[in-house]
Amino acid sequence: MWLIVGLGNPGERYARTRHNIGFRSVETLAERHGLTFRNQRAKSEIAEGIIRGQRVALVKPQTYMNLSGQAVAALRQWYKIDPARELLVIYDDLDLPFAKLRLRERGSAGTHNGMRSIVGQLGTTEFPRLRIGIGQPPGQMDAADYVLSRFTPEEEAVLPEVLARVADAVEVVVSEGLTAAMNRYNPL
């Protein structure tokens, strides 16, 4: 069983923002595999099903970004998963250029408050993550304002391709393993 968590903020106000690229990623996966999100448990929308022969739960925590760990910790208990082997968190990263993907087995939360919450609630940094580059804020723009801003029209035009690559990478993670996915998608 894989718990695939896309980070974001609930509500229409945040739907198309940079910070919600994690939500859009799991939505792309759900659409590709004919899965439907429902409010089911642990303050999360969940779409359960099979991807490449593996049971998955695609998750959009509805706790707001800074409290994502509450939902992830509750779902870890519900599904009885081992985070090091059965959890993948997908989220935005300011430190990567726009559209760049980076898979890792583990790591610090960095400056990402959603990841800080998850690490704090799980009590470990030992779980896989897929970071999606959103680039740096322009000029003197505050990072908090930037992540809550929408993508430019030029970036939005490229996002379907980026989200398709994210979905492809997740499919490889669940079917062939994290190392295979890292070898295939990190160099791009």
Swiss-Prot record:
Query: Which InterPro entries did the record assign?
Result: Pept_tRNA_hydro, Pept_tRNA_hydro_CS, Pept_tRNA_hydro_sf
Gene Ontology CC terms: cytoplasm
Gene Ontology biological process terms in this record: protein quality control for misfolded or incompletely synthesized proteins; rescue of stalled ribosome
**Compartment(s):** Cytoplasm
Where along the sequence does the record put site: Discriminates between blocked and unblocked aminoacyl-tRNA? N9
The family annotation for this protein states:
Belongs to the PTH family.
Listed name of the protein: Peptidyl-tRNA hydrolase
Species of the source? Chloroflexus aggregans (strain MD-66 / DSM 9485)
